[in-house]
Amino acid sequence: MKVIAVTGYKPFELGIFKNDHPGVECIKKALRRKLTAFVEGGLEWVIISGQLGVELWTAEVVFEIQVEYPDLKLAVFTPFLEQEEGWKEDNREYYEFILSQADHVDSITKRKYESPEQFKLKNQIFIEKSDALLAVYDEEKPGSPKYIVEAAKKKGEIENYHSYFILFSDLQDIIEEEQWNNAE
């Protein structure tokens, strides 16, 4: 596997409203574990669309991993131009910082938002251009990642395409592990 697409919930879907929420570090730890294992297995590129939440936290994790594995690259392919236009200023600054550090940035449609079709096209291209999908996703709570996860599963039924998931139970395990380590 050379290229993995990563996605997951937006912050509000997780009840997270600030990047310093303790849940963010837990999610980043889970992402770090998975991505590091994939890098050790030959992963070269991580692709995201730049959504707030799991995708931008993934970018932060990639930047951390690049210290030890400098050949790992991050690409941000936005579904449309200026997706951050309606965001709060602090979120826009955070997003612009991530874009400034990414190895490649491009917009799939090269136009501003016009319709939900741009998201469908983004999902289609992400699945076509990647070897696997990693999603912070639980079928019990579908949310915004539902459509790309469904597209990945369909591709997996006809081709050698894998979907990997970080479930809520995985995050709970990390929380319990942290509590155990802090109790010692």
Curated annotation (Swiss-Prot):
Species classification: Bacteria, Bacillati, Bacillota, Bacilli, Bacillales
Record-linked InterPro entries: YspA
HAMAP family in UniProt: UPF0398
Pfam family of the protein (one): YpsA
Signal peptide residues on this chain, from the entry's feature table: none
Protein name: UPF0398 protein BA_1582/GBAA_1582/BAS1466
NCBIfam families: PRK13660.1
Source organism superkingdom: Bacteria
Family designation: Belongs to the UPF0398 family.
